[in-house]
UniProtKB/Swiss-Prot annotation:
UniProt domain comment: A Gly-cisPro motif from one monomer fits into the active site of the other monomer to allow specific chiral rejection of L-amino acids.
Enzyme Commission no: 3.1.1.96
Protein name stated in the entry: D-aminoacyl-tRNA deacylase
Subcellular location field: Cytoplasm
One Pfam family it belongs to: Tyr_Deacylase
Protein role: An aminoacyl-tRNA editing enzyme that deacylates mischarged D-aminoacyl-tRNAs. Also deacylates mischarged glycyl-tRNA(Ala), protecting cells against glycine mischarging by AlaRS. Acts via tRNA-based rather than protein-based catalysis; rejects L-amino acids rather than detecting D-amino acids in the active site. By recycling D-aminoacyl-tRNA to D-amino acids and free tRNA molecules, this enzyme counteracts the toxicity associated with the formation of D-aminoacyl-tRNA entities in vivo and helps enforce protein L-homochirality.
UniProt lineage: Bacteria, Pseudomonadati, Pseudomonadota, Gammaproteobacteria, Moraxellales
Root EC class: hydrolase
Transmembrane parts of this sequence: none
Position of sequence motif Gly-cisPro motif, important for rejection of L-amino acids: 137-138
One Gene Ontology MF term: Gly-tRNA(Ala) deacylase activity
């Protein structure tokens, strides 16, 4: 499992020109699921994202997590994160979890995130989404759970 997380001052997801998820200050997290991923690894990833200290403390040091700053978490499923790119000039998506299985695990991941944090929004699994983000920093990190 991989996550590309971005510290944002605001972010939103639109599907068919309708906003389906949005947050103010917080983390925009693109989630890539692989065939070996489980509910346990999904929970571990959510815990890591929520605890990752990418917000400034009073001294300007990255020392606070999204919960400590009362920020939002916007989760967006992103199978392309699992692409193999080491050969050729075309991505190979064989490393991604099959869509039906990924949809179910992503739903479970969202449910767990909402149990852990009260400001959780999502995109729409499998939809063509327009994601807008006001990156803060910018600060971007790739997190991996195996």
């Amino acid at each position: 499992m991989k996550a590309l997380i971005q510290r944002v001052s605001a972010a939103s997801v639109r599907v068919d020109n309708q906003i389906v998820g949005q947050i103010e200050q917080g983390i925009l997290a693109y989630i890539g699921l692989g065939p070996e991923d489980t509910l346990k690894s999904a929970q571990k990833m959510i815990d890591k994202i929520l605890g990752y200290r990418i917000f400034d403390n009073d001294a300007g040091k990255l020392d606070k997590n999204v919960q400590q700053v009362a920020g939002g978490l916007l989760l967006v499923s992103q199978f392309t994160l699992m692409a193999k790119t080491d050969k050729g000039r075309r991505p190979d998506f064989g490393g991604a979890m099959p869509p039906a299985q990924a949809s179910e695990l992503f739903k479970q991941m969202i449910d767990y995130a909402k149990q852990q944090h009260d400001k959780v929004a999502t995109g729409e699994f499998g939809a063509n989404m327009l994601v807008q983000a006001d990156n803060d920093g910018p600060l971007n990190f790739i997190l991996e759970i195996s």
